[in-house]
A protein has these predicted regions:
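Short, surface-exposed charged micro-motifs
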Residues: 138-140, 156
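Short Ser/Thr-interspersed hydrophobic loop/turn segments at strand-loop and sheet-helix junctions
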Residues: 49, 73-77, 169-171, 188-193, ...
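Flexible, small-/acidic-enriched active-site or ligand-binding loops
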Residues: 136, 191-222
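Alpha-helical interface subdomain recognition
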Residues: 1-89, 101-106, 113-118, 131-134, ...
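A short core secondary-structure module
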Residues: 146-147, 151-197
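Flexible, glycine-rich active-site loops centered on histidine and acidic residues
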Residues: 95-101, 123-124, 135, 175
Length: 402
């Protein structure tokens, strides 16, 4: 078992770190205050090859492995969660799901521009009345000749107003005795007639990122845009969540690290009663816990990335990583604020933003409660991963970089 990173991994991490630290860190506080997305972020991520980091070169990507994807997400969220969220929805939910389930024609038409960053994608699954219960979604699509006609609304969609394409799951067979088998997935051009999008303001966190809604009114979608067979929408969606949760877990690991680094720096300079608070044992306890959690979270996401490289289903492992890392990041951010005292209550220091940003990840892409049920199902033997018609792609360096 080799825990070392390759020179390519180190190079990838440096590209992501330099971008986040040098280009985003100096401006993110202002955009967070204004509750506006950083206007150049997505374009730069495309130019640097970050958006297509783990997509084969033949489909416009950088051809790097899934460990590289995790390292990128860790570095991005160490600066701001909005950057990692873009990776989760564009790369995780949309691009990697297309790589797994799309036909060759669909990959050429949609995946190539997504990987290059010339088009932006998102995943549209959550609805006003359907979040964790995916099978309860009400948005629908009816076949009409060589098209489907979509109607309905999606809510809490990251990049909704910025994306060009959306991977959308809707009901195509409302009469199905098993609701999950009545869903189908489509790639929808968000510039189509009948599509409207908008932003949601007043969020607790991720204020430097775009979160919004999408409505579909008699939107015609070519049947050729269906991802998978009719009735496979639930399986496609669950595959998307596996990809997305991996990016959430690795990103949350970066947030833990950011909280740790900020706390160590502050504790060494802040004095109480004539001594740096770093010498106070209760402060040391908090910092030690952050350090432990960072190492555990990192090992969990690297394990999931290793399995993804092998092309193995890792729903259980991504669930472990997602639940632990997101809960640990929320705890680390709260403790970082506590260590900073009154300054932590002000946006003068980044830890205030870390705390606000960290809360969302224990809710989206499968809440902590959903992850608990998933893990209990595996432990009790009541949950078994059945074979998929389109299994996750294994990483092959020679093939992916050709």
């Amino acid at each position: 078992m080799d825990f070392s990173l390759s020179p390519e991994h180190e190079m990838t991490r440096k590209v992501a770190r330099d971008f986040a630290q040098k280009e985003i860190a100096p401006v993110v506080k202002e955009y967070d205050r204004r509750q506006e997305p950083i206007p150049f972020a997505l374009a730069r991520m495309g130019e640097l090859g970050i958006l297509g980091i783990s997509i084969p070169v033949r489909y416009g990507g950088a051809g790097m492995d899934f460990i590289s994807l995790g390292l990128v997400c860790e570095e991005l969220e160490a600066v701001d969660t909005s950057l990692r969220v873009a990776m989760s929805v564009h790369t995780g939910l949309c691009s990697l799901t297309l790589l797994q389930w799309g036909t060759e024609e669909q990959k050429r038409e949609f995946l190539v521009p997504l990987a290059k960053g010339t088009r932006i994608g998102c995943g549209a699954f959550t609805e006003p009345g359907a979040g964790s219960d995916v099978a309860a979604m009400a948005a629908s699509a009816k076949r009409s000749g060589d098209c489907y006609v979509l109607n309905g609304e999606k809510m809490w969609i990251s990049l909704a107003s910025k994306a060009d394409l959306a991977l959308v799951a809707v009901k195509t067979n409302p009469a199905s005795p098993k609701p999950s088998e009545g869903l189908s997935a489509f790639i929808v051009d968000l510039r189509s007639d009948g599509v409207k999008t908008g932003d949601i303001k007043g969020k607790l966190g991720v204020r430097a990122g775009a979160t919004g809604w999408i409505s579909f009114t008699d939107v015609k979608v070519p049947a050729a845009n269906r991802i998978g067979e009719e009735g496979e929408g639930f399986k496609v969606t669950m595959s998307a969540f596996d990809h997305g949760r991996y990016t959430v877990a690795s990103g949350a690991t970066g947030l833990i690290r950011a909280c740790l680094e900020a706390s160590v720096s502050y504790a060494k300079t802040r004095k109480t009663f004539g001594k740096p608070i770093a010498e106070r044992q209760l402060i040391q306890e908090k910092i030690a816990k952050m350090s432990q959690d960072y190492q555990i979270a990192r090992l969990l996401y690297l394990q999931a990335g290793w399995l993804k490289n092998l092309g193995k289903r890792c729903t259980r492992e991504t669930s472990y990583a997602k639940k632990f890392a997101t809960e640990a990041s929320f705890s680390a951010a709260a403790e970082a604020v506590q260590i900073h005292g009154a300054y932590g209550f002000s946006d003068e220091y980044d830890v205030e933003r870390y705390l606000r940003n960290s809360k969302g990840a224990v809710i989206y892409e499968g809440s902590s409660e959903v992850q608990t049920l998933i893990q209990a199902g595996y432990a009790l033997g009541t949950r078994v991963d059945k074979p998929l018609r389109c299994e996750p792609p294994a990483y092959d360096e020679k093939e992916w970089q050709a």
